[in-house]
């Protein structure tokens, strides 16, 4: 049994030389800016403020590594689609992401975090295409689902599963904790499935 509440922040990396040494598998949380990736990490790990949650989009600008245990780490990556970044920042973000995905053999699975109220955006679709191209196991995490009616929750789940297959979506709310156990189970299952 994986004890997520024993998770700890390990380090922040600005460039690939700062990626930490580890034999654990890594699950990346990717998504647009301000979609709830940090809140998702905090909920998975049963901590209130392990990952910084910013009020403004674009606060996570580097890779943040979180150790769940010796076999599993979570990686919070900068959000995409935030227009108020300079060209220099966008270029360094692109290099950092390429370095991570192309050189980090520990990266074994992805959680694509989307805002359930907006569905899959064009940027999300691009990221999902990349995940599929890399052949990573994945789940689409539809956050902020506490703001949707029951019928709208069912509709987004049905729509995405119709496109990408059964069980590809986890409805999630950091507020109500809906979906947290499903996320924890899926993350823990990747330890054996991706080794």
Label each PLM-derived region with a short phrase.
Residues 98-167:
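Conserved C-terminal guanine-recognition region of P-loop GTPase G domains, centered on the G4
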Residues 69-107:
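Conserved nucleotide-sensing/catalytic segment adjacent to the nucleotide-binding pocket
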Residues 66, 143, 183:
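Residue-level signal for inorganic ion chemistry
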Residues 59, 72, 79-82, 117-119, ...:
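Conserved nucleotide-binding/hydrolysis micro-motifs of P-loop NTPases
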Residues 1-84:
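Conserved G1/Walker A P-loop phosphate-binding module
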Residues 49, 62, 73, 89-93, ...:
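Helical mechanochemical/support elements of P-loop NTPase systems and associated helical scaffolds
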Residues 4-16, 147-195:
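Canonical P-loop GTPase G-domain recognition
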């Amino acid at each position: 049994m994986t004890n997520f509440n024993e998770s700890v922040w390990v380090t922040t990396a600005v460039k690939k030389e700062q990626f930490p040494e580890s034999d654990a598998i890594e699950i990346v949380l990717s998504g647009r800016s301000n979609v709830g990736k940090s809140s998702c990490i905090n909920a998975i790990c049963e901590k209130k403020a392990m990952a910084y949650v910013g009020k403004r989009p674009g606060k996570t600008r580097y890779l943040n590594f979180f150790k769940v245990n010796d076999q599993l780490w979570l990686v919070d990556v900068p959000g995409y689609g935030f227009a108020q970044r300079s060209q220099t920042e966008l270029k360094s973000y692109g290099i950092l992401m390429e370095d991570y995905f192309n050189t980090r053999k520990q990266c074994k699975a992805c959680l694509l975090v989307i805002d359930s109220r907006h569905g899959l955006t064009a940027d999300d679709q691009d990221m999902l295409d990349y995940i599929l191209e890399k052949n990573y196991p994945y789940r689409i995490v539809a956050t902020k689902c506490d703001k949707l009616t029951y019928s709208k929750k069912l509709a987004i789940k049905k729509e995405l599963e119709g496109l990408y297959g059964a069980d590809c979506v986890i409805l999630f709310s950091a507020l109500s904790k809906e979906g947290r156990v499903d996320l924890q189970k899926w993350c823990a299952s990747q330890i054996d499935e991706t080794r």
